[in-house]
């Protein structure tokens, strides 16, 4: 079974379509390793709340770094002190392991 720790240690694999989205049962098992994340249809979703705008924007920049390294990019909705992150794999119209890998990497960033 995947844990958040070992998901964060994995690398995303390029996905250009041609595979099926994760089955709901597999996505549910992976979701259990990611505290605070929810499934919103075929999207992985979490809102992070920070003490101020500076911290929220610093986190957005950290997300950009992870996204660039993994070549897997979330939808971001940025508020004054909050950042909503939504992952899904556009090429397959649903969830892939890449979504969970990136979510786990974001969780690891905040383990301070």
Swiss-Prot record:
Its EC number is 4.2.1.96. One of its GO terms (molecular function) is 4-alpha-hydroxytetrahydrobiopterin dehydratase activity. It catalyses: (4aS,6R)-4a-hydroxy-L-erythro-5,6,7,8-tetrahydrobiopterin = (6R)-L-erythro-6,7-dihydrobiopterin + H2O. It is an enzyme of class 4 (lyase). Keywords: Lyase. The keyword Lyase applies. CDD domains: PCD_DCoH_subfamily_a. GO terms for biological process: tetrahydrobiopterin biosynthetic process. This is Putative pterin-4-alpha-carbinolamine dehydratase. It comes from Dechloromonas aromatica (strain RCB).
């Amino acid at each position: 079974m995947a844990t958040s720790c070992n998901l964060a240690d994995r690398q995303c694999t390029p996905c250009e379509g041609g595979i099926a989205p994760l089955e709901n049962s597999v996505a549910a098992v992976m979701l259990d390793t990611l505290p605070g994340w929810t499934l919103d249809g075929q999207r992985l979703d979490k809102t992070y709340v920070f003490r101020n705008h500076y911290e929220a924007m610093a986190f957005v920049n950290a997300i950009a770094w992870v996204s660039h390294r993994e070549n897997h990019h979330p939808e971001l909705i940025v508020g004054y002190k909050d950042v909503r992150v939504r992952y899904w794999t556009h090429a397959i119209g649903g969830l892939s392991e890449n979504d969970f890998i990136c979510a786990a990497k974001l969780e690891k960033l905040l383990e301070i």
